[in-house]
Amino acid sequence: METPILIKLGNGLSIPSVQELAKLTLAEIPSRYTCTGESPLNNIGASVTDDETVPVIDLQNLLSPEPVVGKLELDKLHSACKEWGFFQLVNHGVDALLMDNIKSEIKGFFNLPMNEKTKYGQQDGDFEGFGQPYIESEDQRLDWTEVFSMLSLPLHLRKPHLFPELPLPFRETLESYLSKMKKLSTVVFEMLEKSLQLVEIKGMTDLFEDGLQTMRMNYYPPCPRPELVLGLTSHSDFSGLTILLQLNEVEGLQIRKEERWISIKPLPDAFIVNVGDILEIMTNGIYRSVEHRAVVNSTKERLSIATFHDSKLESEIGPISSLVTPETPALFKRGRYEDILKENLSRKLDGKSFLDYMRM
């Protein structure tokens, strides 16, 4: 087999470029990518169903001046976050042309020559940039993916070798898209406050208003033996809220519901929104962050962009006061967000292990 092109990671390790690997004629899948020996639930062949699907929430209905319409949609949102932890958001008001442009620009980025993409590679001690995060050792199993991760807000924390160096018009398109995602996340947080009937005025939105926003572009190449690999290891998101846009209609995202995996069929131009660990902590377990994973296709690539919306670094994170009562005692510890973030970044992706660490 030809020698694969290597990508240098921020921790000094190097891994093969799976996008370049996928272009080769592979007699067998390299052992570092195979999922043999995984727990039965994490095996690719574990029970997967297409019979159920995540709820669909209509933002126009949520914001409707008609009280009955708004209340019905708000109840649907509450149920979706409580029972599923995921929903698809439609009629969200984000311009269709902007969505088309961001899809085209991201595809263009991943199609750049490798020497162009590695200009944005991870630097020593950093997870941001082009590569693959959460790799801790030479013998760790690898996901069948390549990503470009970047902290986008607040502006003063942007890395000078990443966002400012992106080529035009990609940089301008991405800037516009991320701005829209920030505004959209604020609206969703406001609706979640309303659905929880919080006593605290802006008890949730104040924490996230000037908080961190991280972007992650995902590329999942085709794999000749998709049943042997994972595009993304099963995990729950650390964030408060995640908003994901699929760039094509290739399925691959699956969420865990009890002992089954449910495939999400992305609706055209809908956003897939999910509750993160921080939001589960803040709601004292009312809203649930849910394990999810990505599987890959034998012939088609899959691309997506996710934005993760978090609190300010100096914020104290813990269950919201009015959601802690003698009947519903605090389920999670409190902590400074920056310290909690460092703890999370020191871990590899592993189900809901971070939330287990935060439990009382």
UniProtKB/Swiss-Prot annotation:
Gene3D superfamilies per record: B-lactam Antibiotic, Isopenicillin N Synthase, Chain
Cofactor note: Binds 1 Fe(2+) ion per subunit.
Annotated tissue distribution: Mainly expressed in stems, capsules and leaves and, to a lower extent, in roots.
Keyword list, A-Z: Alkaloid metabolism, Dioxygenase, Iron, Metal-binding, Methyltransferase, Oxidoreductase, Transferase
Sequence positions that bind Fe cation: H235, D237, H292
Highest taxon, organism lineage: Eukaryota
Pathway terms, separated by semicolons: Alkaloid biosynthesis; morphine biosynthesis
Domain named Fe2OG dioxygenase: residues: 211-311
Catalytic class of the enzyme: oxidoreductase
GO biological process: methylation; morphine biosynthetic process
Classification via Pfam families: 2OG-FeII_Oxy, DIOX_N
Any GO molecular function: thebaine 6-O-demethylase activity
Record text on activity regulation: Moderate substrate inhibition. Not inhibited in vitro by acylcyclohexanediones.
Reactions catalysed according to its record: codeine + 2-oxoglutarate + O2 = morphine + formaldehyde + succinate + CO2; thebaine + 2-oxoglutarate + O2 = oripavine + formaldehyde + succinate + CO2; (S)-scoulerine + 2-oxoglutarate + O2 = (S)-3-O-demethylscoulerine + formaldehyde + succinate + CO2; thebaine + 2-oxoglutarate + O2 = neopinone + formaldehyde + succinate + CO2
InterPro entries the record matches: DIOX_N, IPNS-like_FE2OG_OXY, IPNS-like_sf, Oxoglu/Fe-dep_dioxygenase_dom, Plant_2OG-oxidoreductases
Sequence positions that bind 2-oxoglutarate: Y220, R302, S304
Effect of gene knockout: Accumulation of upstream metabolites, such as codeine, thebaine, codeinone and neopine, but reduced production of morphine and oripavine. Lower levels of sanguinarine and 1-benzylisoquinoline laudanosine and, to some extent, of noscapine and papaverine in roots but increased accumulation of the protopine alkaloids cryptopine, protopine, O-demethylcryptopine and allocryptopine, and of the protoberberines sinactine, N-methystylopine, N-methylcanadine and rhoeadine N-methylporphyroxine.
Cofactor(s) for this UniProt protein: L-ascorbate; Fe cation
EC number from the UniProt entry: 1.14.11.32, 1.14.11.31
Family label: Belongs to the iron/ascorbate-dependent oxidoreductase family.
PANTHER family the UniProt entry points to: OXOGLUTARATE/IRON-DEPENDENT DIOXYGENASE (PTHR47991)
Function: Non-heme dioxygenase involved in biosynthesis of morphinan-type benzylisoquinoline and opiate alkaloids natural products. Mediates the conversion of codeine to morphine. Also catalyzes, with lower efficiency, the 3-O-demethylation of thebaine to oripavine and of (S)-scoulerine to 3-O-demethylscoulerine. Supports, with a lower turnover, the conversion of codeinone to morphinone, of thebaine to neopinone, and of neopine to neomorphine.
Name of this protein: Codeine O-demethylase
Gene that produces this protein: CODM
